[in-house]
Design a protein with these regions (language model features):
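C-terminal region of N-terminal signal peptides and the immediate post-cleavage residues
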Residues: 3-7, 19-36
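Cleavable N-terminal signal peptides
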Residues: 13-14, 25
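A low-complexity, Ser/Thr/Gly/Pro-enriched, surface-exposed linker/loop concept
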Residues: 28-49, 74-120, 155-177
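Short, low-complexity cationic-aromatic patches
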Residues: 46-72, 120-136
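Generic recognition of long tandem-repeat/solenoid scaffolds
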Residues: 57-60, 76-78, 142
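Short, surface-exposed beta-strand/loop "edge" segments at domain boundaries and coil↔beta transitions
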Residues: 64-66, 84-89, 147-153
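Extracytosolic low-complexity repeat regions of secreted or lipid-anchored proteins
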Residues: 116-164
Length: 177
């Protein structure tokens, strides 16, 4: 009986020590911060941002970055020099469901958009369940309200994340073929 108490005390001490050293998910440097609330931004008229013969809504992000919302497929993304993107990716894109992904592609993925204009600060462009907004610093955030997932393209960092309760690890681009 005494031996069982000693074993239980030892196991409890080990578990207690492990829990005491646990770090909350929000403090983990490998966990992306949440996507900003783009829905609090003022909406713009999507017709003013129609590109690619009406197939997309497009706008300019940070210098050299083109962002689109595809009205045919429900996809959304930004292409160009993505500051701080994992693996040097030059494309981040998502679809109607699921977490957006980073990739390295040849050329400018959304070249068919042609000339695009920037969104004014603190506005958003929405198509169905996806909204993309720009803040005062020129940071682009796109959020799919259906899955609560999206991405951020900012002046120093770009990442994909989930706003659901579980933490989202930073997304690495797929390996080059």
């Amino acid at each position: 009986m005494r031996r069982n108490l000693l074993v239980a005390a030892a196991v409890g001490a080990v578990i207690g020590a492990a829990l005491a050293g646990a770090v909350p998910a929000s403090a983990d440097p490998d966990v992306a911060p949440p996507i900003p609330d783009v829905f609090s931004n003022m909406p713009v008229n999507p017709a003013d941002y129609t590109v690619n013969a009406g197939k997309w809504f497009g706008f300019a992000g940070p210098p050299g970055v083109v962002c689109i919302l595809d009205t045919l497929k429900g996809e959304y993304g930004c292409a160009g020099p993505l500051p701080g993107a994992p693996g040097g990716a030059n494309l981040v894109s998502g679809g109607p469901v699921g977490l957006p992904e980073f990739a390295v592609v040849d050329g400018l993925k959304y070249a068919d958009a042609g000339p695009v204009r920037p969104l004014p600060p603190n506005t958003r462009l929405t198509y169905r369940q996806v909204s993309c907004g720009v803040d005062d610093a020129g940071v682009v955030a796109c959020l799919n309200s259906r899955d609560q997932v999206g991405f951020v393209v900012g002046p120093t960092a770009s990442y994909a994340a989930s706003n659901r309760l579980e933490a989202t690890a930073l997304v690495e681009p797929p390996p080059a073929p």
